[in-house]
UniProtKB/Swiss-Prot annotation:
The keyword Nucleus applies. Residues 18-114, 1514-1547 are annotated as: Disordered. GO terms for molecular function: transcription coregulator activity. The gene is srb8. This is Mediator of RNA polymerase II transcription subunit 12. It comes from Neosartorya fischeri (strain ATCC 1020 / DSM 3700 / CBS 544.65 / FGSC A1164 / JCM 1740 / NRRL 181 / WB 181). Signal peptide: none annotated. Belongs to the Mediator complex subunit 12 family.
Length: 1612
């Protein structure tokens, strides 16, 4: 059955009614006969006053009160009433066919067929049920209390014409409540009318209805009728007077009695069905339009606005000229009720559309003209609504806005507009709406919310639109006043995110809006947080890297290395220890990484040794097996060549001293391993790393048996133990000879005056260091020395260290590198009263600040030094040197700022006292007495500087000039050293600081301008050491002079001297420095740490002089290159990342010589083969340079390979810099290709080893080289076969194909890391390859499904197990390749876009094929549901464990595939989408059920939902002949067979056209029947769903003949 012409689609805002809930049938929403509790809605909106519009309504609500003045929803069935047949034309007949709006009547609940299952024998049965229910309702109170007896049988029903069904009564009563019209004057004589409820019998007669005519026998009044009444005396036989049971029982008892009875009943039903069948031809035609005058047209419109005027009367004279925008404006002006306005629009539209077919046009042209007319009509509606919105602020604007929105919404939901065009215009208008009209559009958004979000094409656009509006509102200047609007936008965004999450998958704009979206959600709520995490993961998987970026999540090894490097600045050992233990689960690997960090040549400083020792102690306490890890580290022979093993032995020595390392365990392991027996004379045979540790172990605290075992193992290994003892004895004698006061005098013959050897073992160093510490401690508290003079009080001077002794002890311990012993010596030195020693001790702590901080001695030593300073202050012997040193040291201690402030107060007090003291009259004669030839010159100078009186400026000038002459003459007759002279200058400065600074600057400028070479390098270090000059100020002065005075004759020497000033001495050189020289080294070290950028500038300016012409020969060039290389190595190892950045900015590309020196420095660090120009180490540690080639070195392919092999976590910055130098060199194309080959092999090897160092190396290459590496990886990836077939047949696949999958995964990882090299337009060559691969994957899936389904029933036993195993392997491989190809599609998505596809004619078929393959594989129903696994972070599926209860464990592979398809559909043209949907509708594989999948419709819709594309009913199909029986059901054959019918070309491409977008609409299930079977869907034409289309309603007054559907009349 199809709807009546008065029926329609679901009205706006009203729920659908049951399809079969008409009058005369049981209403499923409530008991039969029970009155409807919901008040009836009036059929048309009646204004309160004529011309007054309705009140403003809420446009976003979805309740029934929105249409409180709208007609109720139409019944979706055929109701042919007797009243309508009579056609009296009364107003009451206009309401026939309108049903009540019951909330519970929905289309989801099928109607009851009780009235069709049993025949209605009489209207008594209907009345019986009505009376029974009414009785129950009337006695409900008593029935609840007294429900002990069974209910009595229903009473005998009365005649049907005395009572009517409850719903008819209710409708009549509701209609009576409407506005009572004025009673019409009868113009014709009264005649008797037959009751509409009376039963009709054959011959159009009515049963038991005899109206009074005056001539009936009972109307004759006589004596008999007066006495006895009138009655019919019918002759009744005897049988009729008795019961019929005996006669019927004989028939029923017979064998065929029931069949006869059934035949009788079936014949009766067949007769009734045939009698009720609609056989009349269709009499429907749209109401005609007539030409009227303006006055009559206005009168007609006023009648249309009056709800009391029936539409049937108005349908006779619809005026011409009311169409389009005029129609809508007239309805708005006259306040025509919305329902009647829609009726007028339908009448006009139906006539306009039928006009196209009456002109003799072809079918295709008529459809095109209809589509054009609908689009024009939609444009008129849009203009009408825009005009009302723009008239904001005028009178009655709210009421007009309410009416306009209601009318347009009703037109939209009545399917009278082009949905795609209208919703597209709505989104465009919403996007362009300013803030003052945006609330109106947001209100209308609530009306079309579900229609917009039904398909992704509109939903994604709406999501981005709302987010953009919210972002603009938040960032606007009037954000406070827009707060209600932003709250409204946030509410819409939150609702969209929670209810339509897939619309928030935004591949192009997620990074832009993700923070804004998170602010709209309540992340404290578990649901909101889970949804946002799911969205973030889904969006991350469909995005490709836009640029070269470092990985956000570092490997654990890189993380712990950063923690180790951070100790130098934070000095927080405890937190770094805990963080390191939590970063790596494998504690042995953690210990190995720490030892590598401490011994690598790519880090700087001895503080790493003490950092490693302290961390290992903490880890040992935490339960880590440190001993085993150290022993296994030493057993790896490949590590010795790349590491400084002396640092490792130093760490073990520190651990042995603190009894943290188990020497016994190590010796047991060594014996278990076996010690090789070396001959005694094999001195040239190097020992292995684990055996060399045996020589390094300190033996002072070892038990005797362990000591003896060590000596035994050393003797077996060929090491002379006695040689170690003799070495210790000789060195002790040498040290004692240099420190006789501490260790006593020794025989001169036993003393070796050679410097201490540099190859001492830590066994010797530790023994000597402990011996020195013990000697210094005993010397400081020896009672014999303290009390040798009983008559004099003991003084600290008797047993305190002198400056010379302190310098010697410090020099010895620093040459050993034993800073822990040096810290104990400094602690003993703090008890003396010598200001020089205390100042030198403070400078020593400052020089080794990082190491002492790790040891934990810095704060204690500083406090002891401050206490010593306080003691000296009380004694009146304040030392400026000590104050300067303490201030410099205290500034590096954050917790000692108060102490530093006090020290600065003392310093300023002393300086102000000297500068403000008045000079005595005797000072006028002082200059004449001062003479450099005077033997008492030093004595007089000391007396003058130590006196309390001041010095005038002339005296200051005289003394300054004398001291300057002493410096220039290298001591003069007074025999002052340069250091002592500079110290006197520092004592002279506090008297007149400003004048002194001016004089010293003038003198230094004179030295810089002079041609005398070498004097600056001798004078400047002492001046820096005493504090008269700073390195930074001197560098600034030199640059200023070089810029202002371009004609300086010695610019080259000045630059070279400045460079050499910053170069520290070699490690093997003696470090016996006095206080002034030591302070200079401290200042140079601080300058290198704090100002690396300026040092690089100095190196760049000095290296540029190598190529210039010089008269000094090659020696000066070699010296310059060596100095620059040493400085570069120090800077690179102190802070690798920033140093590499400075090298790239300041050296590479600036000068060829700079590249050459940088290359040599890197080669020395990386340990590459030495070449011409590289440094060679001699036995004493000095450097010898041969030559330096100033031209750029040609890159060697072997060098690149070796650099790549040397790449690890520590050398990565240096290897990157080295490769960058190789890539930047001007070489031929074949060499570049070879380098690309090397890098590709390195990338594959590192990826297979799960390392990521190759990424940093490849990033340095040019964009073209990176593209070549990625293309090679893509080529190898596509070359891997999808499935490896086993040799036994093609139906089963190899069980072990993990190797090919791992290889593919490796190449895919390389491609993904280099995805930033993919151009924005996308490589076109990869598109057909990806399409073919995905198509091949689908074909394999179809083949395997067919093979498995064909062999399932035949296989059993071992074959069945083999088949199951083969199928499982196939599905796993399918999931892997599917996820891998999806990732490739994501990376190359831009290649499929429309601009790129425009240059290829095959772009559209490729896009369609790709979508089809993705949909078919995604929605395939595999036995193991492998596509429903959770992909891991690398996009490959893995099973989820039962205990994994994370709130967002991941997205399904199926969901990810649909997201990829959505991202493609966003960029594909609509034609590709339509072709994909058409193919899937017609030829979808049987294992993929996409037709009824909501996700499929969401992604591929909308598919031609314009009503203009409706299909006209073919005239050649005749009406099915009524066979007198119910038509046979549709055959259950191929469900898609009907979709390929040539008469249905439009419906197979998507959603039925002309219907609402929802698939639950009842009209979308109507099927055209032909010869007893359904041949296709019938699209209802919304323009012809007209009620009251004709003045007299006929039996078949519908737009299409009801005979096509075997429709039957329902008599009520």
């Amino acid at each position: 059955m199809i709807p009546h012409s008065s029926a329609g689609v679901q009205s706006w805002g009203q729920p659908l009614h049951a399809v079969y809930s008409g009058t005369g049938r049981a209403d499923l929403s409530q008991p039969l006969g029970q009155p409807d509790r919901q008040p009836e809605q009036p059929s048309m909106p009646v204004p309160q006053l004529q011309g007054r519009p309705p009140a403003l309504i809420d446009l976003t609500t979805n309740d029934g009160d929105v249409l409180e003045r709208e007609p109720p929803a139409k019944r979706l069935k055929i109701d042919v009433h007797a009243g309508s047949v009579a056609g009296d034309g009364s107003p009451a007949s206009a309401g026939v066919g309108e049903s009540k709006s019951t909330p519970s009547a929905t289309t989801s609940k099928p109607p009851s067929l009780s009235w069709r299952a049993r025949p209605v024998w009489s209207f008594q049965a209907l009345l019986s049920e009505v009376s029974g229910s009414a009785e129950i309702n009337g006695e409900s109170a008593a029935g609840v209390v007294q429900d002990v007896k069974p209910p009595p049988p229903p009473s005998f029903p009365g005649p049907p014409w005395k009572f009517a069904p409850a719903d008819t009564i209710a409708s009549d009563s509701a209609g009576a409540q409407d506005g009572a019209p004025s009673k019409e004057v009868q113009t014709t004589p009264y005649h008797i009318e037959t009751p509409s409820v009376a039963p009709v019998i054959r011959g159009e007669k009515v049963a038991d209805f005899s109206p009074w005519m005056g001539n009936h026998p009972e109307d004759v009044l006589n004596e008999q009728t007066a006495k006895q009444g009138y009655y019919d005396r019918t002759q009744v036989s005897q049988n009729e007077s008795n019961t019929a049971r005996p006669s019927l029982y004989a028939q029923l008892k017979h064998r065929s009695g029931l069949q006869i009875l059934s035949s009788v009943f079936a014949a009766a039903l067949e007769k009734r069905q045939g009698h009720n069948m609609v056989t009349a031809p269709s009499t429907f035609k749209p109401p005609p339009r007539v030409t009227l005058t303006d006055n009559k047209r206005e009168a007609w419109l006023r009648d249309l606005a009056n709800p009391n005027v029936p539409l049937r009367k108005l349908s006779r004279t619809i005026p011409h000229g009311i169409r389009g925008r005029v129609l809508l404006d007239q309805c708005l002006t006259k306040w025509v009720p919305v329902g009647r306005a829609v009726w007028l629009a339908k009448c006009v539209g139906a006539n306009e559309i039928r006009a196209f077919k009456r002109k003799g046009t072809s079918g295709a042209l008529a459809i095109g003209l209809e589509a054009k007319w609908v689009r024009d009509w939609t444009a008129n509606v849009q203009q009408f609504l825009e005009g009302v919105i723009t008239s904001c602020g005028v009178a009655d604007w709210k009421m007009k806005m309410t009416y306009a929105v209601s009318l347009t919404a009703r037109l939209f939901f009545e399917q009278l507009l082009d949905h795609d065009q209208y919703l597209g215009w709505f989104l465009t208008s919403l996007e362009a709406a300013p803030f003052n009209t945006l609330p109106v559009w947001l209100l209308m958004l609530g009306i079309y919310w579900s229609n917009i979000l039904r398909y992704r094409k509109r939903g994604r656009r709406l999501a981005e639109l709302l987010l953009d509006k919210l972002q603009v509102a938040i960032k606007s200047d009037s954000a406070t006043s827009l707060r209600p609007l932003t709250d409204r936008l946030s509410l819409h965004i939150r609702k969209l995110t929670l209810e339509h999450t897939s619309s928030m998958v935004l591949p192009q704009s997620w990074e832009k809006y993700k923070d804004l979206l998170s602010s709209c959600l309540d992340l404290n709520d578990n649901v909101h947080r889970a949804v946002f995490q799911n969205l973030a993961e889904r969006n991350a998987r469909v995005q490709r890297p836009r640029k070269c970026e470092e990985t956000t999540q570092q490997p654990p090894q890189q993380r712990v290395i950063q923690l180790f490097d951070s100790i130098g600045s934070s000095n927080d050992i405890t937190s770094v220890s805990a963080a390191s233990l939590g970063a790596i689960d494998d504690k042995a690997a953690l210990v190995l990484k720490l030892l590598e960090w401490a011994a690598t040549p790519f880090r700087y400083g001895v503080s790493r040794v003490y950092t490693g020792a302290r961390l290992l102690r903490k880890w040992k306490i935490a339960g880590v097996d440190v001993d085993t890890s150290i022993i296994s580290f030493l057993g790896e022979s490949q590590m010795r060549d790349q590491l400084n093993m002396d640092n490792i032995y130093h760490i073990v020595s520190e651990l042995v001293r603190s009894q943290t390392f188990s020497v016994g365990k190590y010796l047991q392991w060594l014996m278990a391993k076996g010690v090789a027996d070396f001959p005694q004379n094999s001195d040239h045979q190097p020992l292995s790393g684990d055996l060399a540790l045996l020589m390094q172990l300190p033996v002072s605290r070892l038990p005797e048996h362990v000591h003896n075992l060590r000596n035994t193992l050393l003797h077996r290994a060929g090491v002379e133990v006695s040689k170690e003892s003799s070495t210790i004895a000789i060195l002790k004698a040498s040290i004692a000879e240099r420190l006789p006061r501490i260790f006593g005098s020794v025989a001169t013959s036993a003393v070796s005056r050679d410097p201490l050897p540099s190859d001492l073992t830590w066994a010797v160093k530790s023994e000597l260091g402990q011996w020195i510490r013990r000697g210094v401690t005993e010397f400081g508290r020896d009672p014999r020395r303290a009390f040798q003079d009983l008559h004099s009080a003991p003084s600290a001077e008797h047993f305190a260290l002198t400056p010379g002794e302190f310098y010697t002890v410090r020099d010895i311990l620093e040459s050993f590198g034993d800073l822990s012993i040096l810290a104990d010596v400094l602690k003993q030195a703090t008890v003396c009263n010598d200001g020089i020693v205390l100042a030198s001790a403070a400078d020593t702590v400052n020089y080794h600040f990082r190491s002492f901080c790790v040891i934990g001695a810095t704060t204690d030593l500083f406090k002891r030094l401050v206490e010593s300073y306080a003691r000296l202050k009380r004694l009146g012997s304040t030392s400026l040197d000590l104050i300067f040193s303490l201030i410099d040291l205290g500034l590096r201690l954050p917790g000692e700022l108060n102490t530093v402030a006090l020290l600065r107060q003392d310093l300023s007090r002393i300086e102000s006292k000297s500068s403000m003291a008045a000079p005595s009259p005797l000072s006028d004669h002082i200059p004449s007495s001062f003479n450099e030839t005077d033997p008492l010159f030093l004595l007089k100078l000391d007396q003058l500087l130590s006196s309390a009186s001041g010095i005038d400026e002339s005296t200051l000038d005289t003394i300054f000039n004398l001291l300057i002459k002493q410096i220039e003459s290298s001591g003069g007759h007074a025999k002052l050293s340069v250091n002592e002279t500079c110290r006197y200058l520092s004592y002279l400065r506090p008297f007149h600081p400003k004048r002194f600074d001016i004089m010293i600057v003038r003198w230094i400028c004179g030295l810089l301008r002079s041609t005398t070479g070498g004097i600056l390098s001798q004078v400047l270090p002492p001046l820096i050491g005493v504090g008269c000059v700073t390195i930074q100020a001197f560098v600034f002065l030199v640059r200023r002079l070089l810029k202002s005075e371009n004609m300086m004759s010695n610019q080259r020497d000045l630059r070279i001297d400045l460079l050499q000033l910053l170069v520290p001495p070699p490690a093997g050189q003696s470090r016996y420095f006095d206080m002034v020289t030591y302070r200079f080294h401290l200042s140079r070290k601080e300058f290198l740490f704090k100002h690396p950028e300026e040092v690089f500038d100095i190196i760049r300016d000095a290296i540029a002089l190598i190529d210039s012409q010089s008269q000094e020969g090659n020696y000066r060039q070699v010296d310059l290159g060596h100095s620059a290389m040493v400085l570069l190595q120090i800077l690179l190892t102190k802070n690798p990342e920033s140093a590499v950045k400075h090298c790239t900015e300041k050296l590479i590309g600036q000068h060829p010589s700079a590249v050459t020196v940088l290359t040599r420095a890197l080669d020395s660090l990386l340990g590459l083969d030495t070449k011409a120009g590289e440094r060679l180490f001699t036995s004493n540690g000095s450097f010898i340079f041969i030559t330096i080639d100033t031209g750029p070195a040609a890159p060697d392919i072997s060098v690149a390979e070796k650099v790549i092999e040397l790449t690890n976590d520590f050398s990565l910055p240096f290897c990157r810099l080295k490769l960058q130098l190789l890539f930047n060199a001007e070489t031929k194309g074949d060499v570049r290709n070879e380098i690309v080959d090397v890098m590709f092999k390195a990338a594959v090897a590192d990826s297979r080893s799960r390392r990521s160092n190759w990424v940093g190396l490849v990033r340095l290459m040019s964009h073209d080289a990176v593209r070549q590496i990625r293309e090679r990886a893509e080529k190898n990836f596509f070359a891997i076969p999808l499935f490896e077939e086993s040799p036994d047949g093609c139906s089963s696949f190899a069980a072990d194909n993990s190797s090919s999958l791992e290889t593919a995964k490796l190449y895919l990882a390389i491609i993904e890391k280099l995805a930033y090299s993919i151009p924005d337009v996308g490589p076109q060559a990869v598109v057909p390859v990806l399409t073919e691969k995905m198509d091949l994957l689908l074909q394999r899936l179809i083949t395997m499904q067919a093979n498995y389904s064909g062999t399932t029933e035949l296989s059993h036993g071992v074959d069945a197990e083999h088949m199951i195993r083969s199928r499982t392997q196939f599905e796993r491989a399918l999931a892997f390749w599917f996820s891998a190809l999806l990732r490739m599609i994501v990376l190359h998505r831009t290649a499929f876009s429309v601009p790129s596809a425009a240059v290829r004619p095959s772009a559209l078929p490729e896009q369609t094929r790709l979508l089809i393959s993705i949909f078919c594989i995604t929605l395939a129903r595999l036995p193991d549901s492998v596509l429903r696994l959770f992909p891991a972070a690398d996009y490959f599926p893995h099973s989820m464990t039962a205990g994994d209860c994370r709130p967002c464990p991941g997205i399904l592979l199926q969901t990810h595939a649909l997201d990829v398809a959505a991202s493609l559909i966003d960029t594909f043209p609509d034609e590709a989408r339509h072709q994909c949907a058409r193919y899937l509708r017609e030829k979808c594989p049987p294992f993929a059920r996409v037709q009824n999948d909501s996700r499929f419709l969401y992604l591929l819709g909308p598919l031609g939902d314009s009503p203009s594309s409706n299909i006209t009913l073919p005239v050649s199909i005749p009406s099915p002949a009524a066979s007198g029986s119910t038509p046979a059901p549709t055959p259950s054959g191929n469900p898609t067979g009907g979709f390929s019918h040539p008469q249905q070309p439009a419906f197979v491409s998507g959603v039925p056209t002309g219907l609402p977008d929802g698939l639950n609409c009842a009209a979308s299930h109507l099927c055209l029947q032909y010869r007893g079977r359904a041949i296709g869907a019938y699209p209802v034409r919304p323009w012809e769903l007209l009620e009251d289309a004709a003045p007299i309603a006929g039996t078949n007054d519908t737009a299409v003949s009801l005979g096509y559907f075997d429709a039957r009349r329902v008599r009520v």
